[in-house]
Each structure stands twice: as C-alpha cells, then as structure tokens.
Amino acid sequence: MSQSVESRVRAIPDGKICDFIDGKLRNDPPEEYVRQNIERRLVLELGYKPENISIEHPIKIGSSTKKVDIAIFRDGRSHVQDNIWVIIECKRDNIPPTDKQDGVGQLKSYMSSTPNCEWGMWTNGISKEVYYKVLTDSQIHFEEPNDIPGPDGDTKFIDRPTREKLNAATDDNLLFSFKICHNHIYTTDGLQKQPAFFELLKIIFCKIEDERNVPHELEFFATASEKSSPDGRLTVKRRINKIFSRVKSKYSAIFPSNDEVNLEPRSLAYIVGELQRYGFLNTGIDVKGKAYEEIVGANLRGDRGEFFTPRNIQRMAIDMLSPKSGEKILDPACGTGGFLVIAMNDIIEQVRGQGSHLGDAYAEALRDQIREIASTSFFGFDINPDLVKATKMNMV
C-alpha cells in the first residue's frame, strides 16, 4: 500500500461515526443516522459547501447556551450566531414533532433567538417540518414551505420544480421521503399499513409517469399555498387524478380501470409536496431499489417467515451469476423483486453498451429490443400475492 493511500485509512471504533461534514468522530445513536443523511443531502443534492455548515453549533438563548444540530451560513460569512441562515434539528424516530422538549417548538425557539435565521427544518426520519420565519410588526410567525432552498436562496422551484431542477436522491434520503409519506398516510388518513403502502405506490407511479410525459410541463407538484387551503388541495387532487388515469391505461395489469387515489386532499397534497423535488428517473438504481424494497418489507412482510435478502447480497449474487441477454431468469421466491430488478438492469446496460456505437438512427430499435427483453426474460413466483404485485411495480 502506498504512503498516500495508507495516510487516508482511518479506524472508526464501534459505536462511533465519522461525521460527513467536519470529519469528527461522534457517538452513533439513532438520531445521528438521520443527521448524517441530511448532511449528505445538503451537500450532494442541494449544493451547499461543507465549509458553510457547522455541526452542533452553540447559540445563546437568554442566559443559557444550546447546540443546534446543523447550522448553515451564507457563503463567506463567519460562523457566529448572528450569521446563521438555516437551522436543522434531527431527532430519533420515536420523538414526535409535538414533543414538548425536542419537537418543533424547540426549533422555533432556536430560530426566534437567532435574528437572521430565516429557514428551519425539523425531522426524525419519518416526519418532517419546514419553516420560513417572517417578522411582521415586531411579531414572528412561521410559514410552512415544501423545503429549504439551496445556497442561492432561490425559492422559485421549491413550489413548482422543472425537470432540469429535479434532484437525484442520495443515500437514504429517498427512503426517508417514502417513510415520511407513508407515516403521514397512516396517521392522517387512518389507513392500516398495507392499504397505506399501496396508496403511496399509486402516487409514486404518478410521479414517474409525470416525469416521463415529455415534453409537457410537470404536473406533479403542490405549492405551499395550495397545501394550506381546501380549494388548493382539491386542485392538487385533480392534477394527480389526471396523471393516475394515464397510469391505469399503461399498467392495467397492476391497476384496474375503476381504481382511484383514495387519499384525503390534505394528505395527498402533503405527499406530493414531499416527493416533487426528486427526479425518480435520474436517481441511481441502487438508491431507488433500497428505498422501495425497505418500504415494501416494512409493510408487506407477512407471517410466512419472509426474509428479504439485503441489497448488497443481491448484488453479489447477480455478479456471480453474470446473466446474459437471451437467457431466461426465474426467482421462485421473488419477494420484492430485488434479484430480478438487478439482473434486468444489468442486462439492459449490456445491450445499451453493445448498441452505443450505432448512433441515433438505431436508438428506437435499441429501445424496442430493451422493452422486449424486459417483458419476456424475467419471471418470479411468491406465496404472498401482495408481494407479487409489489414486484411488478418494482420492475416497472
């Protein structure tokens, strides 16, 4: 091993984690998992510079000193309390937003005591609240936008993103969004876990269909003002119902023609607002696969001893098999379809690579070949009919 490589090797003790922003070793309780994913999202998705982010930054509240989980500063500003622009609080998933000590009230008190802090976010990995602080006649009140802005402060695309502004999800942040949406359906609409999951899948299909509907403008969005009014929520529901009609036409084997989105307008608008920032088509296959398969496993695992193979083991097994175009692949206990999806994507990439030199004239023929391979080469069985349906969705 060379000296340059050897100098970068660092042993991390059990129970510790190396912080993504400042490289410090920290204890690794459940809330740290949430914070590390948020840190990655700030840098890798939103484009913040690590040097403008401070972890466990001290602030004064009256005569006491508190530490905020994440403080963000404008570019080039010194790291003092008066220059904090965004505060983010990260909690473990058993602390609700309404918690008197560690809930959103804590975040609001931090924002109120920090004069130039405009934005705040509170999350426990299954719930998320975003606030924008407004000062009117010496009174502070908090608006509730869909998300915090990037480092340029531009809020235009928070309400209505364009395809060019959709973010590719990183690490477990898409999984966080799925959990947040599912938890919202479960608690707001009163649905049990499985029905709530299938309602969420309808919305995910609508999101993907909307992204594919080129060159038309995106219709999968909910503005903050729409989310805050009954009429606005109904407007969102009408848009999503329009998209879902196209989904049912394309995927009649999954969604019957009389199927509907059975969510209250308030809940639907919240979920759309949470998912709209991500580009599902440009998010990495492994990120999407892990998010989908974990949310499926958490909600559809029955009492028949199902065990879902970890994704890295799936990846290793497919690499060992090295499937080729023209082969038929069967998984007799397919679960969520993870093995099949990885194999399918590997073969599709092989075909694309073989045809990459042919140019645009053969692009349509190549797409036809890929569609034929995807529809005729992969098969799965499972004892759980709900998992069979989930596998179909995963492969689509």
Roles of regions detected by a PLM:
Residues 12-23, 171-191, 271-276:
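Short amphipathic alpha-helical segments and their helix-coil junctions
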Residues 37, 195, 199-203, 270, ...:
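Amphipathic alpha-helical interaction segments
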Residues 205, 209-297:
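Long recognition/docking surfaces used for binding and targeting
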Residues 307-396:
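Conserved S-adenosyl-L-methionine
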